[in-house]
Amino acid sequence: MQCSFLTIFIFITTVTVGVAEFSEQYQGSSSRLTRHLLEKHNKCSPPDGRVDISHNIELVHIIGINELNQNMQVLVYIVQQWTDASLSWKVEEFRGIKHTWLPEHSIWIPDIIVFNTLEHKMLLEAVRSPIKVSYTGEVTYAYPAIYTVLCQIGIATFPFDDQVCKIRFASWAYDEDKILLNASHKPLLKNYSPNEEWALQDVDMARKEYEHEETVVSEIIYYIKVARKPFYYLISLVVPSYIICVLSIAGLFARFSTKHERQERFTLGVTAILSMAVLSLVVTEKVPHSSENVPLLIVYMHFIIVMVTIATILTSTVMRVHAKGFRTHFLSPPNWIRKVLLIARKHANFFQQHGKVYMDIHTTAEQWGEVSRRMDYLLASVFIIIISTPTLYLFYMCFQMDHATAERVLLENAKRRDQLYY
C-alpha cells in the first residue's frame, strides 16, 4: 500500500511540474515577449530612417454608386506592411516564438488615409483587432473598411455608361523622405462579390508623386472601372415609353367616322406626352444635373415626345383634308396627291374593271375621305418606323454589351493571378 501511494504521488508531482514547465515555455514566454516589446518601443515615434510601406487592397464588394451625389461606396480589405527595428527580437531568447500580436493602440502605425474619401467606416473598431508582428520587426496591419469616395460621373451615354473611380491612399503628415508608399500588385479579387447594377470591368493601380508645401508625397491610386447593366432601365423606362408612344400614334391616325369628330384625338396626344414626361423625370432624378452632357436615355425620351407632338399637330391637317370634301362638293383632290397616296393606281384598276369614270361613281366627299384615310395610314406607318428605329438600336446596344461575361472572365483571370500572392 505504501509503495502504491508513493508511486501515485510521484506521478502527480511529475505531471504538475511538466504542466508548469509547458505553461512557462509557451504562455509565459509570450507574455514576457509582449512586455519586452512594449518597453523598448515608443508608439509616438516612427522607426528610424525612411519607412518603406507595402500597401495592398482586396476589393470585396462595390456597395453602390450614387450618381446624383457623384460618389462610390466600396468594401475593401487593406493590408499594410512595414519594418520597425524596435519590434524585433531574438527567437532563441523567447523559446522559438517567431510571431506575436500586439494591440493596435500600443504601437506606431502610419497615418495612411484616403484623400478623396467622404466617409470612412472601420469595421473592426469595436473588435480591437491585434496587429501581427514578426521577430524580424516586420509589422502586418490588416483590416476591412468601407470607403465612400468622390467619383466624377459621366452621364452622356446613360444607361450604357462606364465609370472609372479612384481610391487615393497617401500619408497625411509624412513626406516621401520619411514614408515611401508602394504597392506590390494590383487589387486582389479573390473574395469579390458582384454588384447587381454595376459590372466590374477592370481594376488597376499606379504609384504617383506630387508636391505639397515644398515636400514630395508618394501616393497609391487604385482605379476601379465599372459598367452599368442597362437591361433594367430598358425594361422599366424604354419599353413603357415605346408602348405609350405607339398606342398614341395608332390612336391619332386610326380611321374615324364620316362626321369628322377628331377633337378627342388631341386629348389622347396630350395625355401621351404628359405620361412620357413623367417617365423622363424618373431618369432626371437618377443622374447628375449637368448642362454639359444630356443622358442618351433622356435624348431618346425627348425624341419620342417630339414625335408624338408632331403627330398630334398633323392630326389637325388630316382633319382639314377630311372636312374639305364636305365644304367643296365639286373640287376633286389634285392628281399629284392621288399619285403620292397611290389612290390613282387603285382607281385606274377600278376603271378598267367597271368601265366607268371615277367621278361618276364617287362623290367629292368620298374622294377627300379616301385621301385622309390614306394619309392616316401613311403617317402612322412613318411615325412608328421612326420611333421603332432608335428603340431597336437601344436594345441592340444592350445585347452587344455583354458585361456579365466580361466580369466573369475578369474575375476568373484575377483569381488565377491572386493565387501567386497567397
Curated annotation (Swiss-Prot):
Any single GO CC term annotated in Swiss-Prot or TrEMBL for this entry: synapse
Membrane topology, as annotated: Multi-pass membrane protein
Chief location category: membrane
Coiled coil: none
Signal sequence residues: 1-20
Record key words, sorted: Disulfide bond, Ion channel, Ion transport, Membrane, Receptor, Signal, Transmembrane, Transmembrane helix, Transport
Pfam family, one: Neur_chan_LBD
GO biological process, one term: chemical synaptic transmission
Gene Ontology molecular functions: excitatory extracellular ligand-gated monoatomic ion channel activity; extracellular ligand-gated monoatomic ion channel activity; transmembrane signaling receptor activity; transmitter-gated monoatomic ion channel activity involved in regulation of postsynaptic membrane potential
Transmembrane segments: 234-254, 268-288, 294-314, 379-399
Quaternary context: The functional channel is a hetero-oligomer of pbo-5 and pbo-6.
Protein name: Proton-gated ion channel subunit pbo-6
Organism: Caenorhabditis elegans
